[in-house]
Amino acid sequence: MTSLREFRKLCCAIYHASGYKEKSKLIRDFITDRDDKYLIIKLLLPGLDDRIYNMNDKQIIKIYSIIFKQSQKDMLQDLGYGYIGDTISTFFKENTEIRPRNKSILTLEDVDSFLTTLSSITKESHQIKLLTDIASVCTCNDLKCVVMLIDKDLKIKAGPRYVLNAISPHAYDVFRKSNNLKEIIENESKQNLDSISVSVMTPINPMLAESCDSVNKAFKKFPSGMFAEVKYDGERVQVHKNNNEFAFFSRNMKPVLSYKVDYLKEYIPKAFKKATSIVLDSEIVLVDEHNVQLPFGSLGIHKKKEYKNSNMCLFVFDCLYFDGFDMTDIPLYKRRSFLKDVMVEIPNRIVFSELTNISNESQLTDVLDDALTRKLEGLVLKDINGVYEPGKRRWLKIKRDYLNEGSMADSADLVVLGAYYGKGAKGGIMAVFLMGCYDDESGKWKTVTKCSGHDDNTLRVLQDQLTMVKINKDPKKIPEWLVVNKIYIPDFVVEDPKQSQIWEISGAEFTSSKSHTANGISIRFPRFTRIREDKTWKESTHLNDLVNLTKS
């Protein structure tokens, strides 16, 4: 059984390793011949763990300030300079209530059992007792690691591809499809991995689209022809049905709020009368009585009440699994034909996505013009012979900004990193916001642009919604996670960028700026489009995504 100390040493070695091959080799060498291989891999990838601990950084600080009898204010201030694990370790070392162990005694099994128990409790008094118990058997470094596991970020600069391909060169691609870590560990040989497929009731990493700024580029990507599908302004939903059991997953593979999808349990059996088990890729949109789409955000429970004659409607665009058969390796035109055979539309409830078979540039231009005239979001272009590749950006998207001369072909989903005081009538409140993106390579957040222009009501709401730490443009108070040049040091920084809001930002064009730290990429005339409540920081535009957007 692997000890926590061994696991910590592995994490440290991975962090300091220089590249993908070296990191994967370290993991491969470590797990070879170990009986708890699955547990090691699972804990190396805490972000994939579906256990929910009901605790953010601020709550962890609050609880450990009580346990250690330390100043919560001092602990929060320390957190502003680094990471939660470092803060807890520092104050654990200084506290006089619980003496840290001199020698590590915990196994990974002990830690995993603790995390399972933590995920089952929600009362603060119970959390205090459990976190006290674990601290009493930890060294300072042990507790730091445990807290980082609770925070679901080990800071080892190694994501799923690095870790899973240590098992087998094909493991990461198989995981994208099956999303079943345990099955991959148990079938690690290539022959066995090839037998793993989509399974009903387990979410599949959704296939994605990259931006495209010209019709000509689309035909270079799909020379044999393409489908042009309406880009729906709703929420991506993956539907799973197994007999009378249903599951609905969002684009980040989390359960969808029940009020948005409960009605589907009545209509899916009617639309798919022959299906015992099925997995669908689709978009849920609020439509009026004429089946006209209502704006993004109208799916919210309060917003929906504003549209009295509206319905939730599922626009189905793909079938990934049907009665025991994995459909993902079948060409799209065959999947679509099969879908037409097995699905019966229910008006305003379950309908086919709007799809056009495109054979020339003139036809694509006409379809795009029509979509934009109807004030639709744009088009998604798909290879007619394409297989479904989970997690891969093999499709193309052309959004409404494409036709505006000199404008960005696509927006960027950036994270609010900080804020500045406004001027004049907006003096004394946060009115200008620092937007940025995550750099997977460095593990830091980089700045892209400043954004303003919100109306008074929106600004009033944002003062309460955004959790900020006031630093008064002091360079010494810039948190370790933020890379910002002196000219853009804000009055406030967010307490935790991973809990911050994600805003869709569009503008005239991507531009270069020596003052911004995201590889010098910025946005000319940035404008706020909407809050992306359907995304977490993981689905926001990362630095490598931003680089690709500027290239396209």
Curated annotation (Swiss-Prot):
The keyword Cell division applies. Mg(2+) 2 binds at E377. ATP binds at E229, R236, E283, K382, K397. Induction: Expressed in the early phase of the viral replicative cycle. Its EC number is 6.5.1.1. One of its GO terms (biological process) is lagging strand elongation. It comes from the Viruses. It is found in: Host cytoplasm. Mg(2+) 1 binds at E283. Its cofactor is Mg(2+). It catalyses: ATP + (deoxyribonucleotide)n-3'-hydroxyl + 5'-phospho-(deoxyribonucleotide)m = (deoxyribonucleotide)n+m + AMP + diphosphate. NCBIfam families: dnl1. DNA ligase that seals nicks in double-stranded DNA during DNA replication, DNA recombination and DNA repair. Recruits cellular topoisomerase II to sites of viral replication and assembly. This is DNA ligase. It comes from Variola virus. The lineage of its organism: Viruses, Varidnaviria, Bamfordvirae, Nucleocytoviricota, Pokkesviricetes.
